[in-house]
Every structure is written in C-alpha cells, then in structure tokens.
Amino acid sequence: MNSCRVAPTPHEVTIDPGPSVLLQVEKLWLKYHELQTLYYSAYVESFHFRYFHIEALRYLKLYNNFKTVCRLLERVKRLLSLKYATFTPEMGGGGCGGGCGGGDVPSTLGSEELKVLVNYKDIKKFLDTNNLWSVVESS
C-alpha cells in the first residue's frame, strides 16, 4: 500500500514508496530467516540421524550463509527506515529518524556485503526494481 502526501504546491501529489519497500524487505528477511531456521534444524537433527549426519557440514554452511543474509537484510531494513523516516525505537533509533542522537545509525553496505546479497536473485531484483543501490551502497 502506497501512501500519498501533498507536495509543496496543491496540484502535485507524490507517492511515498516507503511502506511498500519496507514490507518487501521484511518479506525477504522472513523468507531467509525461515531457511536459516530450517538448515539449523537439519544440522541439529544430524546428531541423531545417519542420513543427516552425512550432510551436517553442508547444513551448517547453509545455516551460516542464511544467517549472514538475514543480518545484511536487517541493515538494509534499517537504512530504508531511515530514508523513509520510519525509524522505530525497536530498531535502536529512539523514534526520531535516527538523527537525534539516540541509537546507532546503520552503516551502508560494503562491496563484499553487496556481493553476498546479489548472489540471491530475488534480493538483487528487489534492489534493482526499487532503485535502492544509492541507499545501501557505500561507494
């Protein structure tokens, strides 16, 4: 759902993509968090079942990969929240857009971190479609 806000002149209306973009990144985070949980569960089960034991290191590696993706998506979510001025106290910003000294302002992502994210087609498509590179990239 996009929200409308009135522009400086009464005849212009701009669409604020913030809520939609934040919802999309939340859905991506949830997807990868579920994958992280799945592979962690498979890793734990590998201690009890012979078939899972064979793949234990693979499950652990996948778990760690998805954990990293979730951590990076959390930073993307914080950066987008700052951009669209919806930084909440739960995110550590004190509810004032992150600019009043309360909480940490998240840093943009470095090239290695972006390489991790763009390995996943849906995340790359999300960043491309919403033209978010300038928000998340540190260059």
UniProtKB/Swiss-Prot annotation:
This is Uncharacterized protein 123L. It comes from Invertebrate iridescent virus 3. The lineage of its organism: Viruses, Varidnaviria, Bamfordvirae, Nucleocytoviricota, Megaviricetes.
